[in-house]
């Protein structure tokens, strides 16, 4: 098979391959960029594999960076965008179930391709567009199938993260997982516990955003893989999430965790511990702690609660849509947001300095307490947000405290 017209992303990198070949080495486009081109999907990073060893690549080009030289990868910056060039290699045992104990550089493309995870990722292409498919990846693409290269159990034992990658590709592409590969998922699933949580989380987030996430999660439930994920989530919760994802999927990564935790049978005081078990970012933690309590009782949410999460309202509505909250309820929440007289405490027309300047309070806890009461009074429309009204009301509050 030959691609007659190469996408621009590959044409821009052709001079790199030509230069390597002119020195007597082999060079090919490999990996996800080739796969995505064949699937008519957007192409991201273009990777190159070569028979030249790292030091030979560095001698051929003037601008290089050792991005992963111990594994044979050198970044070449000679032609515009940087391109990662990796030497053909074979790999030894994987004691940590993630990285090979030893990498051996070789001159054979076939040896390099057979160490890869799935057949759809083990396709190479020459600079002129000739496709090299040694493991029937094209057939698997045509039949919409995720199949491991060689023995699936061996592949998953080498790198247990490939279990999550199989599920993720299935969720993104809508491909079925081949029977032998699916059986290996269940057999080797326990090795997920040996993988860094951060790496699992990245794949899991991509999975949930996939158009076919529901089908992929169903496979994970059937293979009993969910028991090896952080947080010990109940099967009933997984089934609820699977049903949600048949209708809609998160369109942005920021929605994932507020949505996900809104569907779990967790008490509010357990949210933070759960998020820590997944090693999420502080921003994700803040979003969850702000949004999930609202979602849990959205029918009775107060104006104060919505005011407190004003900056998260777009995220809140995305979560409410994902879980199928009635439109009437969402409209009521939006009306409360829209009717807020202020959206942040910085919108208040007076500050603590004004209270001090007018000799209404003295520095200390009382000032903060009065400012909070003023803020609440404005939100409830007891008073208007005007300096004269606020100062007058502040005097009343102080007098009431004295009495």
UniProtKB/Swiss-Prot annotation:
GO terms for biological process: RNA repair; tRNA 3'-terminal CCA addition. Keywords: ATP-binding, Magnesium, Metal-binding, Nucleotide-binding, Nucleotidyltransferase, RNA repair, RNA-binding, Transferase, tRNA processing. Its cofactor is Mg(2+). ATP binds at residues 32, 35, 116, 159, 162, 165, 168. Pfam families: PolyA_pol, PolyA_pol_RNAbd, tRNA_NucTran2_2. The keyword Nucleotide-binding applies. One of its GO terms (molecular function) is magnesium ion binding. The keyword Transmembrane helix does not apply. Mg(2+) binds at residues 45, 47. It is an enzyme of class 2 (transferase). CTP binds at residues 32, 35, 116, 159, 162, 165, 168. It catalyses: a tRNA precursor + 2 CTP + ATP = a tRNA with a 3' CCA end + 3 diphosphate; a tRNA with a 3' CCA end + 2 CTP + ATP = a tRNA with a 3' CCACCA end + 3 diphosphate. Its EC number is 2.7.7.72. Homodimer. A single active site specifically recognizes both ATP and CTP and is responsible for their addition. PANTHER family: CCA TRNA NUCLEOTIDYLTRANSFERASE 1, MITOCHONDRIAL. Catalyzes the addition and repair of the essential 3'-terminal CCA sequence in tRNAs without using a nucleic acid template. Adds these three nucleotides in the order of C, C, and A to the tRNA nucleotide-73, using CTP and ATP as substrates and producing inorganic pyrophosphate. tRNA 3'-terminal CCA addition is required both for tRNA processing and repair. Also involved in tRNA surveillance by mediating tandem CCA addition to generate a CCACCA at the 3' terminus of unstable tRNAs. While stable tRNAs receive only 3'-terminal CCA, unstable tRNAs are marked with CCACCA and rapidly degraded. Belongs to the tRNA nucleotidyltransferase/poly(A) polymerase family. Bacterial CCA-adding enzyme type 3 subfamily. This is CCA-adding enzyme. The lineage of its organism: Bacteria, Bacillati, Bacillota, Bacilli, Lactobacillales.
């Amino acid at each position: 098979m030959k691609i007659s017209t190469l996408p621009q992303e590959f044409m821009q990198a052709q001079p790199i391959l030509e230069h390597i070949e002119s020195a007597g080495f082999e060079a090919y486009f490999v990996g996800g960029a080739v796969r995505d081109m064949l699937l008519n999907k957007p192409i991201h990073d273009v990777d190159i594999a070569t028979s030249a060893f790292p030091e030979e690549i560095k001698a051929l080009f003037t601008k290089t960076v050792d991005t992963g030289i111990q594994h044979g990868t050198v970044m070449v910056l000679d032609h515009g965008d940087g391109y990662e060039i990796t030497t053909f290699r074979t790999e030894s045992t994987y004691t940590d179930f993630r990285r090979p104990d030893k990498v051996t550089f070789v001159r054979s493309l076939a040896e390099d391709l057979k160490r890869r995870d799935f057949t759809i990722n083990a396709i190479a292409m020459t600079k002129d567009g000739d496709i090299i498919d040694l493991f029937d990846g094209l057939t698997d693409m045509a039949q919409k199938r995720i199949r491991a290269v060689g023995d699936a159990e061996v592949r998953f034992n080498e790198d247990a993260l490939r279990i999550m990658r199989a599920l993720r590709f299935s969720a993104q592409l809508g491909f079925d997982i081949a029977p032998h590969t699916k059986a290996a998922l269940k057999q080797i699933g326990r090795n997920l516990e040996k993988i860094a949580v951060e790496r699992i989380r990245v794949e899991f987030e991509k999975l949930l955003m996939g158009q076919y996430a529901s089908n992929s999660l169903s496979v994970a439930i059937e293979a009993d893989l969910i028991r090896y994920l952080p947080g010990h989530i109940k099967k009933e919760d997984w089934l609820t999430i699977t049903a949600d994802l048949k209708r809609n999927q998160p369109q942005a990564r920021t929605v994932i965790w507020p949505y996900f935790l809104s569907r779990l049978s967790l008490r509010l005081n357990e949210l933070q511990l759960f998020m820590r078990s997944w090693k999420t970012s502080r921003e994700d933690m803040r979003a969850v702690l702000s949004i999930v309590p609202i979602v849990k009782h959205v029918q009775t949410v107060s104006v104060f609660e919505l005011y407190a999460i004003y900056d998260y309202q777009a995220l809140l509505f995305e979560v409410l849509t994902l879980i199928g909250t009635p439109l009437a309820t969402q409209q009521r929440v939006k009306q409360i947001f829209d009717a807020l007289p202020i959206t942040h405490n910085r919108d208040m027309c007076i500050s603590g300095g004004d209270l001090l300047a007018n000799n209404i309070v003295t520095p200390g806890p009382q000032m903060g307490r009065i400012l909070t009461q003023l803020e609440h009074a404005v939100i409830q429309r007891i008073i208007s947000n005007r300096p004269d009204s606020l100062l007058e009301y502040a005097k009343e509050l102080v007098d009431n405290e004295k009495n």
